[in-house]
Regions:
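Membrane-embedded beta-barrel scaffold of Gram-negative outer-membrane proteins
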Residues: 305-315, 325, 522, 528-534, ...
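Short strand-turn segments of transmembrane beta-barrel domains in outer membranes
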Residues: 138-141, 151-187, 198-208
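Conserved C-terminal beta-signal and adjacent last beta-strands/turns
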Residues: 236-237, 276, 287, 531, ...
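N-terminal periplasmic "start-of-domain" segments of outer-membrane beta-barrel proteins
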Residues: 26-61, 89
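Structural signature of Gram-negative outer-membrane beta-barrels, strongest in the C-terminal barrel
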Residues: 380, 392, 396-398, 404-408, ...
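Acidic/polar loop-and-plug regions of large Gram-negative outer-membrane beta-barrel proteins
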Residues: 222-224, 230-291, 324-374, 437-444, ...
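Gram-negative outer-membrane beta-barrel transporters
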Residues: 395, 473-474, 582-586, 607-712, ...
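Short acidic/polar hinge/loop motifs at secondary-structure boundaries
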Residues: 89, 108-136, 155
Length: 794
């Protein structure tokens, strides 16, 4: 059934408060963007759902990355990772981004190369998001076959029916700023409707040398025709540049320099004798994203309509950007550090880097560089078509069947930007390129390309069918069953390792599929039980097909398989609600890559480990109580047990001939999965002191938190120790907001204080060789910090 976004928002809230008797489980569609958004309604859904409306998103947004707006959700761990603007990670039920599906208005936006999600490329979403639904475990969309941990479904704002304009600004104590303006035309003559949003971020985060310059925009244009037809156009983008903290810290370094320490920058002396900051880590990216959608609603068959709905969306994105990088043939830039006791201690001494480069004895071409600065450039063109139709059979059943095709064309290359006092860089094609010298000049200067020039072209196709059926006199039993088939073909091109005539690889292809289903039974007016399960035979990401860094297709590629199951109880009364869920997920035949410089019998090789299994299970609980509009209390708990389940042997192949070179054993059985806390507790309180004046606070505790690690590094049969266990920590945040009117102008003022207790804690980290604090490295979070701002509404 077609719903406007205002109704979507109402469903998101009301589904936890009352029994909705109408079926909105089948694709709820944005009225503004007219996209089948695969939003589920908790009143009738057999999935574990968390809905975050725009008010809550705005409360969480200031100074935070996009994933951090999904806070206080059991089983979800989202952090800023490095402390740099936009750099973020999210884990759901212990699974990383590769096992989390991200949908934008129902369209998958996770990368096809590795499943990764570069959140800084989507920072504009913070100001353009109307609601987020987190669907843990089995996702509601048949296009989310990587929804093992769960699905994050993002809904963007849309034009309102009446004219509306708002503007806002916030500032963080660390020095970050955001300003935005949002205008909606309201209904225009002949069925048109337009909304515009623009925003700008500037300043810096709490991390040293972390300047920000990021814009964002969203344009939405609707056209309503007669007889149930609509067209919608959206344009979304976020051109950004930000300095990064790209190197993790040790306990010793944090003790010396503090949690804001950033090893990626230093000081350089200018020609006039002044000193200026210079960094090795900066990212710039821009990904304009466009959609054009046609939707049709023929009306319900029991209301005189034909019972058909159809949605066709074409989308297109052009991505272009990159980041600072460096190449070295000796002592790397990071080894030139100001010593203790001097000004700038712990930071890069750029003058020493340049002096070391210039000290090399010149040859016929001049001074040969030991280090050079480069830009590592990457981009892609992404285009696709999503088409589905829904046939309703009264209020008892419906079937949704559809197709999705996507082409993903990528490229990456590296360009010299600074010779650092030398005259040239020697690109050793004889050793580095499979093609050898091949008539190329190894003497390189500023603007020349080195080391990398390749890309991939991938086609991905999915066909699916999804049915919902209600049974019983009061429709108290709801069944869901869906199946999908998927296939991919891909080729890789490489102009560094091959000639123009031989640049394309052979074609690689795989097929997969999924089956998912669920059942919900209403026990009474306020309570229900539900269960769901799924099985995925998932085509590996394209990085698995070309794991050797050249055009040789990896041998013996197999699909990953995922088996999921969940059982839950949901209670929703007028002022009280609760939900308890038990889940299990088995991930089989995971493929992982070793470091490119692992040494087997003194030969540097890279190997792929296949057949690793992991088992995640646990339970989650939510409770809430409210008294009219004056008080609301929420509490949650999540306890999991996530472990790797087997030891495996990996065959090492020659990277060019693919002939076997030997084997290596990996011992991971029983080790805890790292990178997210396996125990979480939390509570929040909201209290209305007076009309328009609200106070809120939230507390979270994270424990049983093991550091991230690569199972492929566990090649010692006697090394069975768990990765380093990061100390548990708790956070207390609070805020106050006031809303009112000055004449006809709406005004909202807010102030938030995060980490009130000034806790020192680690957000993310990597295990070391001793599995103890002496070899651990990670990212420490900010201490006590605040943000404040205002919003004006006309």
């Amino acid at each position: 059934m077609l719903k406007s976004l205002s109704l979507v928002a109402a469903v998101l809230v009301a589904s936890h408060l009352e029994e909705a008797q109408t079926d909105t489980t089948a694709s709820i569609v944005l009225d503004g963007s007219s996209i089948s958004a695969s939003i589920a309604n908790a009143a009738i859904s057999s999935l574990r759902l968390t809905d975050i409306n725009q008010e809550k998103l705005r409360e969480n947004a200031p100074g935070r990355t996009f994933p951090e707006m999904i806070r206080n959700v059991p089983g979800v761990y989202s952090t800023s990772e490095t402390g740099s603007f936009g750099d973020a990670k999210i884990n759901i039920r212990g699974f990383k981004q590769e096992n989390i599906s991200v949908l934008l208005n129902g369209i998958p936006i996770s990368g096809l190369t590795s499943g990764s999600m570069y959140w800084n490329n989507w920072m504009g979403l913070s100001d353009a998001t109307a609601a987020i639904q987190v669907q843990k475990g089995v996702g509601n969309s048949m296009l989310s076959d990587n929804s093992v941990g769960g699905t994050v479904n993002i809904l963007t704002t849309h034009p309102s029916d009446a004219f509306r304009a708002e503007a806002g600004w916030y500032h963080t104590g660390a020095g970050a700023n955001n300003a935005f303006i949002n205008v909606s035309s309201g209904a225009l003559p002949r069925g048109w409707n337009l909304s515009l949003m623009a925003a700008y971020n500037w300043g810096h985060t709490f991390v040293d040398c972390s300047r920000i310059s990021s814009g964002s925009y969203l344009v939405t244009l609707d056209k309503t025709f007669r007889q149930g037809h609509k067209l919608n156009f959206t344009a979304l983008g976020s051109p950004e540049t930000h300095q990064q903290r790209s190197v993790r810290l040790s306990y010793e370094e944090v003790g010396k320099y503090g949690a804001a320490y950033n090893k990626s920058w230093g000081w350089q002396t200018a020609e006039d004798g002044s000193r200026f900051q210079r960094t090795t880590a900066r990212n710039q990216y821009f990904k304009p994203y466009f959609t054009l959608t046609h939707s049709y609603d023929g009306g319900r068959s029991d209301d005189g309509g034909n019972g058909w709905k159809a949605f066709n969306t074409f989308y297109l994105a052009f991505a272009n950007g990159g980041g600072y990088y460096s190449e070295s043939s000796g002592s790397r830039i990071s080894s030139f550090i100001f010593p203790e006791g001097t000004e700038g201690a712990g930071q890069i001494d750029w003058d020493a880097v340049i002096a070391h480069n210039a000290a090399t004895a010149p040859d016929a071409n001049g001074i040969r560089a030991v280090n050079v600065m480069t830009d590592y450039l990457a981009g892609h063109v992404q285009a696709g078509l999503k088409s589905n139709a829904v046939k309703e059979f009264g209020d008892r059943a419906d079937i949704d069947f559809g197709l999705h095709w996507q082409i993903y064309d990528t490229w990456e290359k590296e360009r010299i930007t600074d010779l650092l006092g030398a005259d040239y860089w020697f690109e050793d094609y004889e050793k580095k390129s499979l093609a050898g010298l091949a008539g190329r000049n190894p003497v390189k200067g500023v603007g020349d390309y080195v080391r990398t020039y390749n890309g991939r072209r991938q086609n991905y196709f999915t066909a699916y069918a999804l049915a919902h059926c209600k049974a019983g006199r009061k429709r108290q039993l709801v069944f869901t069953l869906g199946a999908s088939l998927s296939a991919t073909t891909l080729r890789r091109w490489d102009l560094y390792n091959y000639s123009e005539a031989e640049k394309w690889s052979d074609r690689a292809s795989r097929a997969g599929g999924s089956v998912k289903g669920g059942v919900l039974y209403r026990l009474g007016r306020f309570s229900k039980i539900y269960a769901n399960a799924a099985y995925y035979s998932r085509v590996p990401y394209s990085s698995v097909f070309f794991s050797n860094g050249n055009n040789q297709i990896s041998r013996d590629i197999c699909n990953e398989s995922n088996s999921l199951a969940e059982l839950g109880y949901r209670l929703a009364g007028g002022s009280f609600g609760a939900e308890i869920t038990a889940y299990a997920a088995l991930w089989k035949n995971k493929s992982l890559f070793s470091s490119p410089y692992s040494t087997i019998e003194e030969d540097p090789v890279k190997y792929m480990v296949k057949g690793l299994d992991a088992f995640h299970y646990g339970f989650e609980a939510d409770l809430w109580w409210s008294y009219e509009k004056f008080v609301r209390i929420d509490a949650f708990a999540s306890v999991g047990d996530w472990r790797w389940k087997n030891d495996v042997s990996a065959t090492i192949y020659d990277p060019t001939t693919l002939q076997p070179m030997g084997t290596v054993n990996v011992y991971a059985d029983g080790l805890h999965v790292g990178d997210a806390p396996q125990t979480q507790l939390g509570a929040s309180l909201r209290f209305a002191l007076s009309p328009g004046l609200d106070v809120h606070a939230d507390w979270t505790w994270n424990d049983r938190f093991w550091a991230d690690f690569d199972p492929v590094t566990r090649t010692d049969p006697d090394d069975r120790e768990d990765p380093y266990r990061i100390p548990s920590y708790h956070l207390l945040n609070a805020g106050v907001s006031w809303s009112g009117h000055i004449r006809k102008l709406g005004l909202v003022l807010f102030l938030n204080v995060n980490n009130i207790l000034d806790s020192s804690y680690i957000e993310r980290g990597k295990d070391g060789s001793t599995h103890a604090s002496d070899s651990f490295t990670g990212y420490w979070a900010d201490g006590r910090n605040l943000n404040f701002g205002l919003r004006l509404v006309l």
